[in-house]
Amino acid sequence: MTRRSLIAAALGLPALNALAQFRVEVTGVGLNQLPIAVAPFRGQAQTPVALAAVLMADLERSGRFKSIDAAASALDETSRIDFAQWRSRGADALVTGSVTRLADGRYDVRFRLWDSVAGQDQGGQAYVVPASDLRLAAHKAADYIYEKLTGERGVFSTRIAYVGQTGRQFNLWVADADGENAQSALASPEPIISPAWAPDGRSLAYVSFESRKPVVYVHELSSGRRRLLANFRGSNSAPAWAPDGRTLALTLTRDGNSQIYLIDARGGEPRRLTQSSAIDTEACFSPDGRQIYFVSDRGGTPQIYRMPVSGGAAERVTFAGDYNISPALSPDGRSMAFITRTGGAFRLQLMDLGSGAVTALSDGGQDESPSFAPNGRLIVYASRQGGRDALMTTTLDGKIKARLAGKGGEIREPDWGPFLTSA
């Protein structure tokens, strides 16, 4: 059972199956990419992680950078830089660094960013980490470099959650933003669907079928403890957090058809928000917390609507096509990613909410469950392409796509977590 199949069952529509594995792969060419070289870190050959490669892959996935071959010679953060040589190679920026194993088994990771055009030191950082956090150190370095060169916060040290199924086993995976280092937050022989990050990044809400019906839990990641949030009569599904973390929207059938309700994050009696005779589901909040976007078939086919959280009339948002689902709002509230059905395929699209203009971000496969990166510059989604499951990211123009690393089996319903609360 997946979120799409649950929605399809409610709306009387066919569901899709997905099987495969996925690998790291970046495709496409973007405009105005900054050419950057990342030299092999001195000492990284003696570590279990190729730090420079992880860092460069992060920058490439963002769509903002073009990789320049740094050759095989290692340069550390104290190396004397021949800027003319790097300019001749076409690199406007250069990253150098080192990694040293300490006596206690931890690693000292250092890096420095250089402006090859101006011949200037742009600063750097140092981290002391256990071997298990070497990839995180590379992601943090990529965050620093991304922010220095773009003026925007990087998302490489954030996390994603998604659902995987291998045989009869379901897992709720939490992974790095590149899909690596996946850890199982929950394993179950019964379906798990609809993972949703709390705004503070400490918990995940999700739907479990272990009670032989869909119920909603909130799972604290650090302790592994979880609490039952919604087990009302009928179906309990599609949790979505309000931006302040105090309230969640849910889809409940306690009063008949699937409708949107609001519930305190601590539990209690839910308040019904939608009041239609149709099927209303898949709610998400606007970033300011004032609006709810949701899917409804009240017009005859599944379309996306919005309404005030305080209640009132619903306004239709999507008009093109007869099947539009899975709304996800950008952090600035200006754009909405969603899935549309075109010629039997489910494809990712992006709408400018100001103008209503729609951009197709994928041209094939069976896409589902878009979720924005916390800086709003990338979208993660699940896709089935060529008979294989893939966890994908795309830039907002659709030009740069990356197939992320991760676990095999069926891959579904990714949700991109918030910025880490600690540095």
Q: What do these predicted ranges mean?
A:
Residues 153, 164-171, 187-190, 207-216, ...:
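A flexible loop/linker signature enriched in serine peptidases of the S9 family
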Residues 199-200, 243-244, 287-288, 331-332, ...:
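Residue-level detector of Asp-centered blade-edge/turn motifs that repeat once per structural unit
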Residues 25-85, 95, 99-100:
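Short beta-strand->alpha-helix linker/helix-N-cap micro-motif
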Residues 1-12:
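N-terminal secretory signal peptides and thylakoid transit peptides that target proteins
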Residues 117, 176-180, 220-224, 264-268, ...:
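Short loop/turn segments that connect beta-strands within beta-propeller blades
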Residues 79-144:
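Amphipathic beta-strand/beta-sheet edge segments enriched in Tyr/Trp
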